[in-house]
A protein has these predicted regions:
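Catalytic alpha/beta core domains of metabolic enzymes, predominantly
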Residues: 149-263
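Conserved active-site and cofactor/substrate-binding residues in soluble primary-metabolism enzymes
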Residues: 33, 40, 67, 71, ...
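A structural signal for short hydrophobic/aromatic patches embedded in well-ordered alpha helices
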Residues: 41, 72, 164, 244-247, ...
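Active-site beta->alpha loop and helix N-cap motifs at the rims of alpha/beta catalytic domains
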Residues: 2-156
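Alpha-helical structural signal in soluble globular domains
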Residues: 71, 75-79, 104, 108, ...
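C-terminal alpha-helical cap/extension of soluble enzyme domains
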Residues: 2-11, 20-24, 48, 216, ...
């Protein structure tokens, strides 16, 4: 049974749309979340034009304790201070834990929750549906159903997505499909739902141009290239093809380097760039990690980052 909530809380909720970065977590020398750097990151996110923010796999969410997750959610709502929508990842290895995370997110003032299926067991389709139904019915918030099988977990069948959408409607159930190949799978989900599904992409920017043309409602990149992704989204919205490809190419080249080492590759390069930008004091990641950035890759990232800065600075890229 869904929890009852006051109409005033529901009316204040902000919709998810546009550029919605997934925050990275700064850690101090004692491996604690550095809340001063986190606040700095959130302020920068909105200063460059993002529409909201959230947590996800690149937030190292599965490496946090339950208490850390709850405190992080509270801090993100506090630091955002009404400047945009806030959503958090609530996926867990059990339905009861996922539901508890979702309830905590609603109580903290989030606008939506997002969840992946359990990652340590391969579930039949009916169990996947039951898992998401449990989360959906535990809160009044919209639920983003995330298929992160391009890098972790199992794919979610389109039939399961259609069942959830039919049961709860498009305002309650949203989607972030990341199964490979992303573009064709995104279109297949769009078509299977008769165009009713609200769909977000999360490729880090490398597939944003293709996904945009297939009808997405927004993108959920990392924060490291956020100014570039905001400029790219604006260029796409304006139909500016020249700016679109000028910005997209260096973003795609950087993300291609990140993809070489899976989630650890993304985290290592993303945090390297956040330190380079002056947003984080440390590129520390929660251990254990399987890959670290080498000097030659870092130099190539630097070259591409300079090219991205040049592309963003051109007049065609900065028009909104």
């Amino acid at each position: 049974m869904a929890i009852a909530h006051s109409p005033d809380v529901h009316a204040a909720r902000r919709p998810l749309c546009g550029v919605l970065p997934i925050v990275h977590l700064p850690f101090d020398a004692a491996d604690r979340i550095d809340e001063a750097d986190l606040r700095h990151e959130v302020d920068w996110i909105f200063s460059v034009g993002a529409d909201g923010l959230g947590t996800g796999m690149v937030s190292e969410i599965v490496r946090l304790s339950a208490d850390e997750r709850a405190r992080l959610t509270e801090r993100l709502v506090e630091f955002t201070a009404g400047r945009g929508s806030v959503f958090v990842s609530v996926g867990a290895e059990s339905g009861s834990v996922a539901r508890a995370h979702a309830v905590a997110a609603e109580q903290a003032g989030c606008d939506a929750v997002m969840a992946v299926p359990p990652m340590t067991v391969r579930l039949p389709a009916n169990a996947v549906v039951d898992y998401f139904r449990g989360i959906a019915e535990s809160v009044s918030l919209p639920l983003v159903v995330q298929d992160a099988s391009g890098y972790v977990g199992q794919p979610i069948l389109h039939a399961a997505c259609v069942e959830l959408l039919d049961r709860y409607g498009p305002e309650k159930i949203l989607f972030k499909p990341e199964a490979s190949p992303l573009g064709p799978n995104l279109s297949a989900l769009r078509d299977a739902t008769g165009g009713r599904a609200t769909i977000f992409e999360g490729s880090g920017g490398i597939l944003l141009v293709d996904a945009y043309r297939r009808g997405i409602a927004g993108t959920m990149p990392g924060v490291d290239l956020l100014d570039g992704v905001v400029a790219l989204w604006r260029a796409l919205s304006a139909g500016d093809e020249e700016a679109t490809y000028a910005i997209s190419l260096p973003i795609s080249a950087i993300v291609a380097l990140q993809m070489q080492a899976g989630l650890d590759g993304f985290l290592a390069i993303e945090k390297y760039l956040l330190v380079k930008r002056g947003l984080f004091r440390s590129a520390r990641r929660r251990e254990p990690v399987g890959w670290s950035l080498d000097d030659e890759t870092a130099r190539e990232v630097d070259r591409l980052f300079d090219r991205l800065a040049e592309a963003i600075a051109t007049p065609c890229a900065t028009r909104s």
